[in-house]
Amino acid sequence: MDPLQAVHLGPRKKRPRQLGTPVASTPYDIRFRDLVLFILEKKMGTTRRAFLMELARRKGFRVENELSDSVTHIVAENNSGSDVLEWLQLQNIKASSELELLDISWLIECMGAGKPVEMMGRHQLVVNRNSSPSPVPGSQNVPAPAVKKISQYACQRRTTLNNYNQLFTDALDILAENDELRENEGSCLAFMRASSVLKSLPFPITSMKDTEGIPCLGDKVKSIIEGIIEDGESSEAKAVLNDERYKSFKLFTSVFGVGLKTAEKWFRMGFRTLSKIQSDKSLRFTQMQKAGFLYYEDLVSCVNRPEAEAVSMLVKEAVVTFLPDALVTMTGGFRRGKMTGHDVDFLITSPEATEDEEQQLLHKVTDFWKQQGLLLYCDILESTFEKFKQPSRKVDALDHFQKCFLILKLDHGRVHSEKSGQQEGKGWKAIRVDLVMCPYDRRAFALLGWTGSRQFERDLRRYATHERKMMLDNHALYDRTKRVFLEAESEEEIFAHLGLDYIEPWERNA
């Protein structure tokens, strides 16, 4: 997900500490009129309650200073449902059966999403029906992070797309991306690891106490988390989003074929817009960059799943024309369950193909598309794979399989969707496609590597090296102690060799 699209960071306003009764509500626009919230001060404190009330109002929620008949939701922190009912009884207030008793994590998620989120079981405060409403050990539905030790390795964590901490991870992803654009490798990795571990948590962070025992959260990261808890936003991420260099590099590298070196050059030359770059006669562009500019509007828009499925059919139809027994697998984010992406990746292999047939397939397929008028751009990198070469020691090493970077013309009629991101008046869309051809005996390693996520693969290789004395890449797994290559016909076998529980593709969104 593009962090620029994923996070909404409003203006940061430092507030002095408040004492005493919370101030009256300020005249913010109420966007969600069906919900009337009351935030319970018990176990929360006056200052934090006042801050949360103010923040919720800024986000468009109606929050009452006092409990009244109009309240539909009571939100509490570190209280069980029984605690809340006991408090209501002490106030001589009878709770309506329609009144929702919710943990503060629900409101935090609402504010992160900018709208009310669905009330799940984990949000509902538990009321013990068999006793008077008093504190009952274990009855409250407040998540506890230290139930089980959390691994520092993403390959030992299950990370689905259900991110309870997006407010934090979006900010950390922006900071990581900024460091990557500046080639600050150490800081970038620290932010990426922190974001990755937060994405795996089955509960939302609502206070700094929740971060206790969680690995990969250094002092800098904890400071950022604390700032977001207090202010509802990250001043550091906001500063990056407003930074001219960051905005320029993001814009320039959004062009297919433009890397950091070219972006740096254009920035130093004083360019800030793509139109100025395209109109400058002194600049020379590669064929890839020319294609990137030509189809920019299509390529910069996300590919949705119906479009990816249509491309998958296009690829399979072409491949089996020349290799009927070939196996074509969609990899990358779409294999991990994502609904959108910036390109579509495919791994191709064949159990019966000769080495020559493997080497010729991508050439035949791209020639076939060229004859059909579907090939808008093509760059084939020939294989440099060596069967008995040990895996790379680098956790980010690229593989040596034959691969093809394409832009294909996807006709609107092939997409089974009401909306397919087409430009109005145009019957097709340019789609970025990567094809990888690998030998059949290496398919498991290639599939594991090309599925991602990037952080999952990095940690998988790091785990193999540091914990198992093995070397893993997209080609092979090598045991340095026994000095042998370990064969595998499936991803499950690779996990077994490493002594790891198998992680499904949709649980690798680290």
Swiss-Prot record:
InterPro entries: BRCT_dom (IPR001357), BRCT_dom_sf (IPR036420), DNA-dir_DNA_pol_X (IPR002054), DNA_pol-X_BS (IPR019843), DNA_pol_b-like_N (IPR010996), DNA_pol_lambd_fingers_domain (IPR018944), DNA_pol_lamdba_lyase_dom_sf (IPR027421), DNA_Pol_thumb_sf (IPR037160)
Enzyme Commission designation: 2.7.7.31, 3.1.11.-
Effect seen on changing residue 473 to A: Nearly abolishes enzyme activity
Residue ranges occupied by any BRCT domain in the UniProt entry: 27-124
Alphabetical UniProt keywords: Cytoplasm, Hydrolase, Magnesium, Metal-binding, Nucleotidyltransferase, Nucleus, Phosphoprotein, Terminal addition, Transferase
Cofactor: Mg(2+)
Tissue expr: Isoform TDT-L: Expressed in the thymus, and, at lower levels, in the bone marrow. Detected in both cycling and noncycling pro-B and pre-B cells (at protein level). Isoform TDT-S: Expressed in both cycling and noncycling pro-B, but not pre-B, cells (at protein level). Not detected in mature peripheral or germinal center B cells.
SMART domains, sorted: BRCT (SM00292), POLXc (SM00483)
Region (Mediates interaction with DNTTIP2): 151-510
Effect seen on changing residue 400 to A: Reduces enzyme activity
Effect of residue 399 to A: Nearly abolishes enzyme activity
Region (Involved in DNA binding) residue spans: 258-262
Binding-site residues, Mg(2+): 343, 345, 434
Recorded catalytic activity of this chain's protein: DNA(n) + a 2'-deoxyribonucleoside 5'-triphosphate = DNA(n+1) + diphosphate
Region of interest called Disordered, as start-end residue ranges on this chain: 1-22
Cofactor note: Can also utilize other divalent cations, such as Mn(2+) and Co(2+) (in vitro).
Residues bound to a 2'-deoxyribonucleoside 5'-triphosphate: 333-338, 342-345, 449-450
Record GO cellular component, one term: nucleus
GO function term, MF aspect, one: DNA binding
Membrane-crossing residue ranges in chain numbering: none
Family per record: Belongs to the DNA polymerase type-X family.
Protein name listed in UniProt: DNA nucleotidylexotransferase
UniProt lineage: Eukaryota, Metazoa, Chordata, Craniata, Vertebrata
